[in-house]
C-alpha cells in the first residue's frame, strides 16, 4: 500500500495531523493483528461477506470478548476487496480527529481522493462542504470500498454521527460501512433496516459451535471427549474469550472433568 506522508486538516483553528510514519496514528488505520490462537471460521467469514455484499451498513454487536474484531480481521485478511480500517477511541468524538482518520484510512487502502476534497479539508472538517465532497468522491468509487469502524460504541457525539449518516446516505454503492460495537449503535439504523440496507450480526451469530470450539482447543493441544467438549461449549455459550481462557486452564489442569464442573456459566462473562 502506498504511503501518503502527513495529511493535515484544520478544525476550529487547530491543526489535526495523521502521519503515516507515526506508529500511534498508523495503528489507528490498520487492521489489528489476528491472535495466534484464532481459528479460521468459514461460517462467520461467509456471513460477513454476504452481508457486506448486499447491505450498505453491517453492524456487529456483542459484549467484550465475543470475537467481533477478530472475525472482522479474519474476513479482511481474506482479500475481500478494498478495505479501510479505523480503530476508534473517545477522541473520535471530535469531528477533526474522526474525519482525519477516515480520510487517512481511505487513502491507505488505495482510494484516490480528489483535490476538491483537500480544499474542503482546509475548511471546517466535518462541515457541510467537506461531507459533500467526501460523499461525492466515494459515490464515484468503483469497485466500492468497505470502511470498518471498530468500537463504534465509543462514538457518541451527535455531530460526528450525523455526519457519518449523511455520508453513508449519499454515497450510493461506492461505500460499504461495517461497524463493531459493544452496544446498539447510535446511528439511525432503523432507516437502513426499513430500506433493507442493514445487516445485523449478534453475539448468537459469533458464538462458537461445538466443532469450532474443538478446533480452538486443538490449537492449544487440549484433548477433550465429545461430552466434555459439548459441556464446555454449553457452559461458555460459545463465548470466544471464555473458551480461550478455559483452553489455557486445561493445559495445566490434571482433571478436565473437575475443571468443567467448577466452570461458571458463561465462564464468568
Where are these regions (language model features)?
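Walker A (P-loop) ATP-phosphate-binding motif of ABC ATPase nucleotide-binding domains
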Residues: 57
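Conserved phosphate-binding/catalytic loops and adjacent sensor/switch elements of nucleotide-binding enzymes
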Residues: 64-66, 70-145, 154-156
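Loop-to-helix "switch" segment enriched in basic
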Residues: 20-21, 138, 183, 193-194, ...
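Long, basic/Gly/Ser/Thr-rich N-terminal segments
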Residues: 1-9
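Short, conserved phosphate/pyrophosphate- and ester-handling motifs at nucleotide-, phospho-/glycolipid
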Residues: 41, 69, 239
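A conserved switch/coupling segment of P-loop NTPase cores
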Residues: 49-53, 77-80, 127-206, 213-214, ...
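Conserved adenine-nucleotide phosphate-binding loops and their immediately adjacent elements
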Residues: 12-48, 115-119, 215
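Hydrophobic anchor at the beta1->P-loop junction of P-loop NTPases
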Residues: 60
